[in-house]
Each structure stands twice: as C-alpha cells, then as structure tokens.
C-alpha cells in the first residue's frame, strides 16, 4: 500500500497533544491512523494522531499532556475512571498517564525530553533513524505538559512532578484549585500564587492557555520564567474567553512567549460549529489567524499547538488536513519566509531557552 506521507526532510513540532488521555480511554495509539480508524469505526472525532503517524509524518517533537477532566464538567456518559473529584483522584488519574508515557519510553516509542541536552540528542537521532514506531525507528520526542494543575495535591509536591519530567504546567482547564479557567471566570487563588512561586524556583514553564482573563493577567504580571500559550487562537476571530485578545498577545510577546495555534475549526473561524462540514474552514483560515498574531507578536513567536484529538477529530479540522502527518500541508498557509519557524524552529528556539541545560 502506498504511504500516506511524502518523504520528510524536516522535523515538525506540535506543542499540544493529549496522547495519554486518549490512550487511557482505550484508543491504541501504537497503531497507525488507518488501522485505528478501521478498528474504531467512528463517524465523528476520527483519530488524527498516533505514535507511528507522528513519526512517519515528521512530527517527531510534541508537547504531550497529562490532562484529567473534572467530573463536574465531564459529559454525562463519561466513565468516572476517566474523571476526578478532588485533588487525590486528580493525582491518581494523572499518575496513570505519567506511567503510560514512561512505558512508551521504555518500549522505544517516545523519548521524554527533560533538558536542552536531551533535546539536542533527540534532534540528532531523528536525522538518522528511519520513520516508524518501536525499536530501531525514530521515536517521538515528548515534552511533558500538565494541563490543569489539580493533580498537584499541594504546591510543595511540584518538585516530585519535576523529577518525573514535567517541564510545563498550565494552571487550569475549567477552574481548578489554582485559578479560574475557560468558561469559569476567577482569579488566581492563594494556592495558585504559591504554585507559581514553586514553578519559578524549579524552572518550569507556565502555559497560559485556558486561563480565565483575570487569572491570566495576575499570573503574567508577576511571572519571570519561561512562558507560552501552547494552544490558543486569536479572540479577534472567535470571541470567547478560550482565546487571546490582542492585549494578551502583546503582553506575551513582550515576555518572548510562544503562541501555538489550535487546528480546531470552531476555534479558527467565527460562526463555525462542530456539526458544520469540514470544508467550512480551510488552511487559509489558519493563515489568517497566524498573520493576525504575527502582526502583534512577530512571526518568530507563532507556532502550532494543534490539540488534535482533544475533543475533536478529523471532521472538525480544516479542509486539507486528514491526519497529524499532514503538517507539511500547513506550509501554504504562511509566508514562505515564516514557514520553517512556525512549523518547527520557533518552538526549538523557545525550548533551548526554556529547558534546563541538563
């Protein structure tokens, strides 16, 4: 069977994928996209990203999340084993995902990137190892990102998560004990301020995606460490507190933060819902988002944080994207001189400046 991927001469970087969350819910991410789609037989939210797909498509560096869903915000049919109520349950669910990443690393499927030295070693290995999955093939480099900090039972526990390889933390998804979040306005809590202090002492990066506006400004104004919005679009296109307004983008740029564009149709174009045809949004709409943010922050601070399979799938992504390995098709959405930066090197620059040396 012919390959779905052209020959890849570049490495691509995706700054937001919920790999473990999907896997613990029963999606076998060690399969190819075609095999998993055939196995699942879905007519919506068809899978976009699996480990072989990422490697074969050249997306060999990703920010992979530890994400657990608060039970009170979960769909009614969500099994309790995938959700949490309280810090202890959040911790247990998150450790399950952490252990999955550790197993994948032991199997040679991924490499967890803990330092700038690890990053350079991984980049060198991708130049020689063949695409694929498992021993002898190019593993996917993974920077671990905690999306929603409730699994951290106390701020003092954060050091343990650092030792496990977590390098980026976002305080909220909806609300957490630490901060207000998407659709749930609120400030930083006292615990949130304590957590930010611990993060800065450890050298962790702060992900502001999903922070409620009040929490965003309180966090950013007192923050001096590495900063990013791993998966956020412009509020100028879709007016929701899920996205960044121009003043937020400007504040992030002043702190040399990166912004990763989400490739979900309802987040890219006003008036588009999950039920609308895939063709409702095109790669030109991705380009429009990128140009708006770049006009404020500069192209050097624009990247991709696709969030593929983060509650949406094939049917809810722009026309022309069929799988995670289609990253190369995004090139046409950006000015030629910006393509390499947006698809890879901007994130690499940020990581080299943000990760511990060793």
Regions found by a protein language model. Give the residues of each.
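N-terminal hydrophobic targeting/anchoring segments and the immediately downstream early-domain regions
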Residues: 1-190, 239-358
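Loop-centered beta-sheet repeat module
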Residues: 185-220, 229-231
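A short helix->loop->beta-strand "cap" motif at the edges of active sites that frequently abuts
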Residues: 204, 225, 257
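Acidic, glycine-rich loop-and-beta core segments that form the ion-binding/anion-interacting portion
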Residues: 212-214, 220-221, 226-240, 244-253
């Amino acid at each position: 069977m012919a390959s779905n991927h052209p020959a890849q001469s570049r490495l691509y970087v995706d700054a937001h994928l919920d790999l473990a969350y999907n896997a613990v819910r029963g999606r076998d991410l060690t399969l190819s996209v075609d095999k998993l789609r055939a196995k699942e037989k879905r007519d919506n939210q068809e899978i976009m990203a699996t480990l072989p797909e990422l490697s074969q498509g050249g997306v060999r560096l990703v920010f992979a999340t530890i994400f657990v869903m608060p039970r009170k915000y979960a769909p009614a049919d969500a099994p309790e084993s995938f959700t949490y109520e309280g810090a202890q349950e959040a911790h247990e669910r998150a450790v399950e995902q952490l252990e999955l990443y550790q197993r994948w690393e032991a199997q040679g499927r991924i490499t967890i990137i803990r330092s700038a030295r690890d990053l350079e070693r991984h980049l060198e290995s991708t130049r020689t190892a063949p695409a694929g999955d498992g021993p002898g093939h190019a593993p996917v480099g993974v920077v671990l990102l905690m999306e929603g900090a409730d699994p951290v039972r106390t701020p003092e526990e954060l050091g343990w998560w650092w030792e496990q390889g977590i390098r980026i933390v976002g305080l909220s998804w909806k609300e957490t004990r630490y901060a207000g979040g998407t659709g749930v306005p609120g400030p930083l809590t006292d615990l949130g301020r304590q957590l930010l202090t611990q993060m800065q002492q450890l050298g962790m990066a702060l992900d502001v995606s999903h922070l409620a506006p009040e929490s965003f400004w309180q966090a950013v104004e007192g923050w001096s460490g590495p900063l990013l919005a791993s998966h956020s679009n412009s509020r100028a296109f879709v007016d929701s507190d899920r996205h960044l307004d121009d003043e937020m983008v400007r504040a992030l740029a002043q702190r040399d933060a990166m912004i990763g564009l989400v490739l979900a149709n309802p987040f890219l174009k006003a008036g588009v819902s999950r039920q609308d045809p895939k063709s409702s949004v095109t790669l030109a709409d991705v380009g429009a988002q990128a140009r708006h943010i770049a006009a404020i922050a500069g192209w050097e601070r624009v990247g991709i944080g696709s969030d593929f399979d983060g509650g949406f799938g094939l049917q809810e992504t722009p026309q022309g994207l069929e799988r995670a390995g289609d990253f190369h098709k995004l090139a046409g959405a950006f000015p030629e001189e910006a393509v390499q930066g947006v698809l890879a090197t901007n994130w690499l620059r940020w990581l080299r400046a943000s990760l511990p040396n060793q």
